[in-house]
Design a protein with these regions (language model features):
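Mature extracellular/passenger domains of Gram-negative fimbrial/pilin and adhesin proteins
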Residues: 2-11, 17, 22-185
């Protein structure tokens, strides 16, 4: 009886070893182990438009501004334009779109976003955003104005500007991070 089961046990062990070795062999046949990573980010939305890929993560270059160019509270620098491009828009779903910009506001001026963070941050300055008509967009507030949606593609134009929030502006990092959300009517 012992003799009869022994070949079955040996066969099982040999076959197990063969199957365990297959994935290793398959990996080495295709050039070795993993050499890199590809990550895919996306979202399925139920909205009138989709945000174009090049508008999802933007960098607006604000440039350098001399701290002594501000002589009083509430002064603005030159505007820096940016846009939000919407694709695959359908006016059958909604007729208008508005944008809410969110982020940390400046403690001295709630109409602009806080700039800099930590050691080396600029002080006495924030970033304000205006729409295509030049109206200041109040941070963290539902849209006050809506733009008509164009069938297919809609482009929303904005400008960003530094604004002094103190009579004295201290030089340093004046970057900010702001998010946007679309609202439809």
């Amino acid at each position: 009886m012992w003799q009869k089961k022994r070949p079955d046990l040996c066969s099982t062990l040999i076959l197990s070893g063969f199957f365990l070795a297959l994935p290793v062999q398959a990996i080495t046949d295709y050039g070795g182990f993993r050499d890199g990573d590809v990550r895919f980010f996306g979202e399925v939305v139920n909205a009138a438009c989709a945000v174009a890929v090049d508008s999802q993560d933007q960098t607006v270059l604000m440039g350098q501004v001399r701290s002594n160019s501000f002589t009083d509270l509430g002064e603005w620098t030159d505007p820096h334009p940016f846009r939000i491009k919407l694709e695959d828009c359908s006016t059958n779903v909604s007729q208008n779109v508005g944008v809410m910009f969110s982020g940390e506001t400046d403690g001295k001026d709630l109409l602009v976003f806080r700039t800099g963070n930590g050691a080396g941050a600029a002080e006495g300055i924030g970033i304000g955003i205006t729409d295509a008509t030049g109206q200041l967009i109040i941070p963290n507030t539902a849209p006050a104005r809506y733009a008509p949606i164009q069938e297919g593609e809609t482009v929303l134009h904005y400008t960003a500007r530094y604004r002094s929030t103190s009579r004295t502006v201290k030089a340093g990092n004046a970057s900010a991070q702001v998010w946007f959300n679309l609202f439809y009517q």
